[in-house]
Curated annotation (Swiss-Prot):
One of its GO terms (molecular function) is hexosyltransferase activity. It is an enzyme of class 2 (transferase). It is found in: Golgi apparatus membrane. The lineage of its organism: Eukaryota, Metazoa, Chordata, Craniata, Vertebrata. Belongs to the glycosyltransferase 31 family. Residues 38-47 have a biased composition (Low complexity). Residues 32-401 are lumenal. Residues 33-85 are annotated as: Disordered. Keywords: Glycosyltransferase, Golgi apparatus, Membrane, Signal-anchor, Transferase, Transmembrane, Transmembrane helix. This is UDP-GlcNAc:betaGal beta-1,3-N-acetylglucosaminyltransferase 9. It comes from Bos taurus (Bovine). The keyword Kinase does not apply.
Length: 401
């Protein structure tokens, strides 16, 4: 009898504990539910975005930014993808020696005594030789294009883990990567290499070092296009856009992003803690995949960026430098640093089509093979067979669900 009573008490206690645990889990789940913005008032239409501008908000909760084709998802870690402690300790170190230079890149000649009309500067990494070759053989080819002189440089840092001590670098330590890059520089005369680790959060160092280099070695350049190695650029369309522009006036045009909020999700590639940036939104900036600026703006930015505290996201940092100069980046709908979105009415539409690309200036996110293929589709002997200009899908960038 006593044993039965004890068993009943234990069973009842187990049920009570289970119910209590269930209530606690339910309450925790409700408390962690993502918050949403306040509902819009009935009968009032949402304000439309300014044409050419991208208005998007970073997710506040555990949702990471949408993955694009080719992205490799990384499991979240409790410490985040980046060592901000190390970054904060070293962020004031902003001068690194130039290991490979191209001092004559912007020298003039008989036909072009002032040097190039357009300098193309492409961010790259040491191992990405295939993409550099694709750029050299297609849209980044040097020479005359529509009467303009075009020159090209690639911007690199030292591959991580190979040793970036200034003394070692200046002593010319012969490592595998340095030998290959020096051979590539001798062959193509377009490599700029600085002695900082070539990491995502050091792209800001690449930005300020290039601005300083271009101000010193290309003082008379009219315009500069700066972009990634995985973009396709229609240089003819770019030069048409620049033709009526005065290089002595301020200009920075591209895929302009406004009202972007810092991402506070540790698992995100773009995670920024409040200790690094405490304001609710970034200043307006042009997507780093590709933008164009005048020679006058380049020289002003070189001075402004030398006075702005370094920030680990390079295109946002450039927006901070523009803000210091009280300049506003100019939005251009033909700069597509988020690729070409498929219209909702035609979800199966193939956007990798020369009839789309012939209307654009920059498209981001292409492989080396895609760059080569699109270039030859557009510039082949017959050209693309397009009955009429195709409408390019437009609209503000939206984070996926």
């Amino acid at each position: 009898m006593r044993r039965r009573l004890r068993l009943r008490r234990e069973a009842l206690l187990t049920l009570l504990l289970g119910a209590t645990l269930g209530l606690l889990l339910y309450a925790q789940q409700e408390g962690a539910a993502p918050t949403t913005s306040a509902p819009r008032a009935q009968g009032r239409a949402a304000p439309g975005p300014t044409p050419g501008l991208r208005v998007f908000q970073a997710p506040d909760t555990g949702a990471a930014p949408p993955a694009y084709e080719g992205d490799t998802p990384e499991p979240p870690t409790p410490t985040g993808p980046f060592d901000f402690g190390r970054y904060l300790r070293a962020k004031d170190q902003r001068r690194f020696p130039l290991l490979i230079n191209q001092p004559h890149k912007c020298q003039g000649n008989g036909a072009f005594p002032r040097g190039p009309d357009l300098l193309i500067a492409v961010k790259s990494v040491a191992a990405d030789f295939e993409r550099r070759q694709a750029v050299r053989q297609t849209w980044g080819a040097e020479g005359r294009v529509q009467g303009a002189l075009v020159r090209r440089v690639f911007l690199l840092g030292v591959p991580r883990g190979t040793g970036t001590v200034a003394g070692e670098a200046e002593a010319g330590t012969q490592t595998h990567w340095s030998a290959l890059l020096r051979a590539e520089s001798r062959a193509y005369a377009d490599i700029l290499l600085w002695a900082f680790d070539d990491t995502f959060f050091n792209l800001t160092l690449k930005e300020i070092h290039f601005l300083a280099w271009a101000s010193d070695y290309c003082p008379d350049v009219r315009f500069v296009f700066k972009g990634d190695a995985d973009v396709f650029v229609h240089v003819g369309n770019l030069l048409e856009f620049l033709a009526p522009r005065d290089p002595a006036q301020d200009l920075l045009a591209g895929d302009v992003i406004v009202q972007a909020r810092p991402i506070r999700v540790r698992a995100s590639k773009y995670y920024i803690p409040e200790a690094v940036y405490g304001l609710p939104a970034y200043p307006a900036y042009a997507g780093g995949g590709g933008f164009v600026l005048s020679g006058a703006t380049l020289r002003r930015l070189a001075g402004a960026c030398a006075q702005v505290e370094l920030f680990p996201i390079d295109d946002v940092f450039l927006g901070m430098c523009l803000q210091r100069l009280r300049l506003t980046p100019e939005p251009h709908p033909a700069f597509r640093t988020f690729g070409i979105p498929r219209p909702s009415a035609a979800p199966h539409l193939h956007t990798f089509d020369p009839c789309f690309y012939r209307e654009l200036v920059v498209v981001h996110g292409l492989s080396a093979a895609d760059i080569w293929l699109m270039w030859h589709l557009l510039h082949g002997p017959n050209g693309p067979a397009c009955a009429r200009p195709w409408p390019v899908p437009a609209g503000p960038f939206q984070w996926g669900p």
